[in-house]
Curated annotation (Swiss-Prot):
The gene is ispG. [4Fe-4S] cluster binds at residues 264, 267, 299, 306. Binds 1 [4Fe-4S] cluster. One of its GO terms (biological process) is isopentenyl diphosphate biosynthetic process, methylerythritol 4-phosphate pathway. This is 4-hydroxy-3-methylbut-2-en-1-yl diphosphate synthase (flavodoxin). InterPro entries: Dihydropteroate_synth-like_sf, IspG_bac, IspG_bac-typ, NO2/SO3_Rdtase_4Fe4S_sf. Belongs to the IspG family. Converts 2C-methyl-D-erythritol 2,4-cyclodiphosphate (ME-2,4cPP) into 1-hydroxy-2-methyl-2-(E)-butenyl 4-diphosphate. Its cofactor is [4Fe-4S] cluster. GO terms for molecular function: 4 iron, 4 sulfur cluster binding; 4-hydroxy-3-methylbut-2-en-1-yl diphosphate synthase activity (ferredoxin); 4-hydroxy-3-methylbut-2-enyl-diphosphate synthase activity (flavodoxin); iron ion binding.
């Protein structure tokens, strides 16, 4: 299956390009109170090392806005301010922030939006029109309810409003908590404009539910060439948001990065402690950013076949096993020695690629 991405306009959030030919960026949002400067910076640091590209923060009042200015000065990542209800906070934050997200369902009048646009235009920063099925403007929800039709009307209305103000540094999100509706919303909007899309399923739930919903919705859209930046929303799971987002990009074939682990589900043929081995391998390889296929198999039935397509592989047997690299056996060892040797081969593979580059 050939992947062909929809060509969108390119904008910039800080030093991160979004749209056009830029890589699909991964975002997250802090769950600290923004006025907690140290706590917010600690979470930003965690996201930075997890591989996030952009971070969004809530701004409820001027205490948050003033704190955000200090956070921005110390942040290693571009920051977006998330604004609801009070457009004056967006105007204030536009002086130092990298991007503004507004919810057209609660930002208020056209005059409010004009003020936000003026502030963002002066700084040259983008605005995300963040349409959410749970907070559609009354004029559209009264006519269409809270479904995709209302979301489309809201998006197009607000796009035109910004364009009429000669503002084009726009990205758009069309979020619902339902995977199918999310897919429909983005698919129907895509032919109507060429602005970059921020993908996400809102209020997706805890790790398990979010992973399922986000994989279905975001994976589906990405395979259709839709999407320029994305967030996997999870209740209270910062690093996991990034990890799952990167996995969706990798397993959809859209953007290769990090380790792809192939492992068997286990059965009665297993004669080794495969479960413990997998846990160790996952933990010890999660820092790797290089695209790498590794295989950890519990018996000989599929192990050698999978190893041929892997960069590094283990084939467990009874009390012993093989370490395989690019289809060639490099070691036959006792079970207790296999994982350490395997991990050493993985690290050597990463280093050898770095030298070639």
């Amino acid at each position: 299956m050939e992947y062909k991405r929809f060509k969108t306009r390119q904008i910039k959030v800080g030093n991160v390009s979004i749209g056009g030919d830029a890589p699909i960026s991964v975002q997250s949002m802090l769950f600290t109170k923004t006025r907690d400067i140290e706590g917010s910076l600690e979470q930003i640091s965690r996201l930075y090392f997890a591989g996030a590209n952009i971070v969004r923060l809530a701004c409820l009042d001027m205490a948050d806005a003033r704190a955000l200015k200090e956070i921005k000065a110390k942040s290693p990542l571009p920051l977006i301010v998330d604004i609801h209800f009070n457009h004056n906070l967006a105007v204030y934050c536009a002086e130092f922030i990298d991007g503004v997200r507004i919810n057209p369902g609660n930002i208020g009048s056209k005059e409010n939006i004009k003020e936000v646009v003026k502030a963002c235009k002066e700084r040259g920063i983008p605005i995300r029109i963040g349409v959410n099925h749970g907070s559609i403007e009354k004029q559209f929800s009264d006519k269409f309810g809270y479904g995709v039709d209302a979301m489309l009307e809201s998006a197009m209305y607000n796009i035109k409003l910004l364009e009429d103000l000669d503002f084009f540094d726009i990205k758009i999100s069309m979020k619902t908590s339902d995977a199918q509706k999310t897919i429909e919303a983005y698919e129907r909007l895509r032919p109507l404009c060429d602005y970059p899309f921020h993908l996400g399923v809102t209020e997706a739930g805890t790790k398990f539910h979010s992973t399922v919903k986000s994989s279905i919705a975001l994976g589906n859209l990405l395979l259709k060439g839709i999407g320029d930046t994305m967030r996997v929303s999870m209740t209270g799971e910062l690093e996991e948001e990034i990890r799952v987002a990167r996995a969706i990009l990798q397993d959809s074939g859209v953007q290769k990065s990090g380790v792809n682990i192939i492992s068997c589900p286990t059965c009665g043929r297993i004669q080794s402690d495969l479960l413990s081995a997998i846990k160790i391998v996952e933990e010890k390889t999660k820092h790797i950013k290089e695209p790498l296929n590794i295989s950890v198999m519990g018996c000989v039935v599929n192990a050698l076949g999978e190893a041929k397509g892997a960069d590094v592989a283990i084939a467990f047997g009874k009390n012993q096993g093989l370490v395989i690299r690019h289809g060639e056996v490099v070691a036959k060892l006792k079970e207790s020695e296999l994982v350490d040797r395997f991990l050493a081969e993985v690290e050597d593979e990463v280093k050898s690629r770095a030298v070639k580059e």
